[in-house]
Amino acid sequence: MPLTDNRALRILDHAAENRYAVPAMCCYNVEGILATVRAAEAKRSPAMILLFPWAVHYADGILVHAAAEAARKASVPVTVHMDHAQTPEIIRYAADLGGFDSIMVDMSHYEKAENLALTRELVEYCHARGIATEAEPGRIEGGEDGVADTADLEGMLTTPEESQEFVDTGIDWLAPAFGNVHGEYGPRGIQLEYDRLQSINKAVRLVLHGADPFTQEIFQKCIDCGVSKININKVLNNPYIKVQQEKAGKVPLTTLLEEATNAMQKAVEGCIDRLGSGGRYP
């Protein structure tokens, strides 16, 4: 498939042009995939199903193909994205596996020169297969379940000059570090540099990581600064855990799975409302 036909590029372009953000939901199981698609259909919103490399290692691609089939059958635009692919081997494997519309080429744990060189090489590999790409200039602090632990690495904020260097690799989207954090924000709370974000947006489409605790006001400020994709993790998955904790062993397994999926769907619908993506595909 030529890159010009890539669905993920189309939905993010539409979001940027119409000043909203696409909810990108981190899914670890079929329930998360179903919840994301059902919420998108109920709200007539685009959506992205995010899978970590863990999903490939754990289920040998089965979860990827399930996500791709769910996205294909959806009545609104839904795409499948590999988030935080951190080795050349997993990126090439995912690109050849089929099912992914986009892949995050995350070489942020390498020093800058090697990061840029690897990113350029892997972007070319993905583009040749019709797959859109994302990169992380700078380094977002913290860690995330399903991602190789980089919490001990020092965070580095993204500069406009650095963004341009990544744009020159051919990358389609950037996930800048502007005070956002993977995981918990800690005692200092949320401290974002919106001016930095806005200056980076002049060069490329922006995506946002580390957004779980953000308010609607913060989301809107980020969208105003050019963000068109927002990754969500715990907001989706905590309701699943809560249902499991409260009802496991007390109701039939089928009921448990259905109630967990319904709780996750409500969470995704709330995200859609906060990001302004509902009603975009009647």
For the regions a language model picked out, list residue spans one by one.
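Glycine-rich phosphate/pyrophosphate-binding loop regions near the starts of catalytic domains
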Residues: 84
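Thr-Gly-centered strand-to-loop micro-motif
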Residues: 208-210
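Alpha/beta enzyme core
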Residues: 6-17, 28-50, 54, 62-77, ...
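Extended, intrinsically disordered, low-complexity segments
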Residues: 244-282
